[in-house]
A protein has these predicted regions:
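Short gly/ser/thr-rich secondary-structure transition/capping motifs
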Residues: 19-21, 92-95, 134
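N-terminal, active-site-proximal structural segment of metallo-dependent hydrolase catalytic domains
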Residues: 1-57, 61-64, 71-73
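Active-site-proximal beta-strand elements of phosphoester/diester hydrolases
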Residues: 8-18, 107-119, 153
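Acidic/histidine-rich, metal-coordinating catalytic segments
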Residues: 148-155
């Protein structure tokens, strides 16, 4: 483990609301706060548009699941490459929304999520949110059963 002089790992979550537009602020925040792991939501870019080189220039390695124009999640780690474990929330092979990414980093399993909004009540988006939450609950139970250091974070 390379994180922190005390062996502690600092994990943060940041809804960037568009990584291209907010990249300067994200870099500033990463340099100021220096989390060991940062989970990003709403990166709002396709995979090929993710600024991995800009983040690597300040010491962060990344994995990401992009989606054009909305959604999208990423997991960054300072000085260590996150190892992808799960891309997309299990349980619905037809769900194409980029809202769940899971990785091993610094000996911890980290899941970064961007939860569906689902407003207003009674709509298809609300029903999707409820199904998504059921799937998240099922995945959380699976992760707990592993009895490994695990964190689920996001927005």
């Amino acid at each position: 483990m390379n994180a922190g002089s005390t062996g502690a790992v600092t994990i943060a979550s940041f809804n960037v609301n568009g990584i291209k537009a907010r990249l300067p602020r994200l870099i500033e925040w990463l340099e100021e706060t220096r989390p060991d792991v940062a989970c990003l939501q709403e990166i709002k870019t396709q995979d090929e548009g993710f600024p991995a080189a800009d983040l690597a220039a300040i010491g962060y390695q990344a994995i990401w699941q992009g989606q054009k124009g909305f959604n999208g999640v990423a997991i960054l780690a300072r000085g260590e490459q996150p190892v992808e474990v799960q891309r997309g929330l299990p349980g619905d092979p037809e769900d194409e929304q980029s809202r769940y990414l899971e990785a091993e980093v610094f000996g911890i399993r980290v899941a970064g999520i961007y939860l569906p909004n689902g407003n207003p009540l009674g709509t298809d988006t609300y029903a999707y949110k409820l199904r998504w939450l059921e799937r998240l609950h099922a995945r959380a139970k699976e992760l707990l059963a592993l009895e490994e250091a695990t964190i689920i974070t996001g927005d």
